[in-house]
A protein has these predicted regions:
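Mid-protein regulatory/catalytic core that forms ligand/cofactor-binding pockets
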Residues: 117-224
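Extreme N-terminal segment that seeds HTH/winged-HTH DNA-binding domains in transcriptional regulators
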Residues: 1-47
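Basic, amphipathic "hinge/linker" alpha-helix immediately C-terminal to the N-terminal HTH DNA-binding motif
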Residues: 72-91
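Short, hydrophobic-biased segments on the C-terminal half of alpha helices
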Residues: 57-58
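Key DNA-contact positions within bacterial/archaeal DNA-binding proteins
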Residues: 51, 107
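A short, conserved structural fragment
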Residues: 61-69
Length: 239
């Protein structure tokens, strides 16, 4: 048995397979850590048929990794949550290592990490993290769980929610779409960047953003994939 599979073992159970780890990670992400995920949301995220997802959900519930209540969605149990966080740690450390140590662009690290996360042992991932200075976030701003399973679950504001005149610092960008990441990179909408909403066109028109002397316009659908920490002096939400 490989070290990676040995370390993915839940006490009293067989080692978790890559598909099971993918399910747990998806449910954690959809439910924002502690909330519920609908089976159709899981199916959409994993690009699977809803019937296949329903069957797997029942099996994982029988294994004690999920709590499932009809019409109320799926939640991770404590053991399921721990397993999801182990997988997320491997994924996000690998992303950070690829970017910092190997110079990968931020739009390519997600797919590489998806392939590597199930094969890498926890020891290898810990060494990767140490080599690049124990990063707290991945290249897209997502928090990296610690070795003991703790993680920053702060809920941030979507850029699409900021009102005209509000400022914020970009903290996280959705990482699933490489083309979107490349485009945001070209616009310099990156974690750590301070931006101000200059104007909003009506009827879901473009949002004009300013950063220093630089201005760009993006649509609200794209802005919804960017999370910001509003700056208290001028921050606000659309209401």
């Amino acid at each position: 048995m490989s070290a990676a599979r040995e370390e993915s073992r839940v006490p009293g159970r067989e080692p978790l397979t890559a598909p099971v780890e993918d399910y747990l990670k998806a449910i954690y992400t959809i439910g924002k850590g502690t909330g519920a995920a609908a089976t159709n949301e899981i199916a959409q995220r994993l690009a699977l048929a809803p019937a296949s997802v329903s069957g797997m959900v029942r099996r994982l519930a029988d294994q004690g990794l999920l709590a499932y209540e009809r019409y109320h969605g799926v939640k991770l149990t404590e053991s399921g949550r721990r397993a999801a966080l182990r997988t997320l740690r491997r994924h996000r450390v690998i992303e950070a290592y690829l970017a910092k140590a190997l110079g990968y662009p931020w739009d390519r690290v997600h797919e590489e990490a998806e392939r590597l996360e199930h094969a890498a042992s926890d020891e290898l991932v810990d060494r990767m993290a140490a080599t690049i200075g124990e990063p707290e976030v991945d290249p897209h701003g997502a928090p990296i769980p610690t070795k003991d399973g703790s993680v920053d679950e702060t809920v941030y504001t979507s850029l699409a929610e900021l009102v005209v005149g509000a400022s914020g610092v970009v903290v996280r960008v959705a990482d699933e779409d490489p083309e979107m990441l490349r485009y945001l990179g070209e616009l310099s909408i990156l974690p750590g960047k301070r931006i101000t909403v200059k104007s909003r066109a009506p009827y879901d028109g473009p949002i004009t953003l300013g950063s220093g002397r630089h201005e760009v316009s993006i649509g609200p659908a794209l802005a919804a994939h960017v999370l910001v920490a509003p700056l208290a002096d001028r921050a606000g939400k659309r209401g």
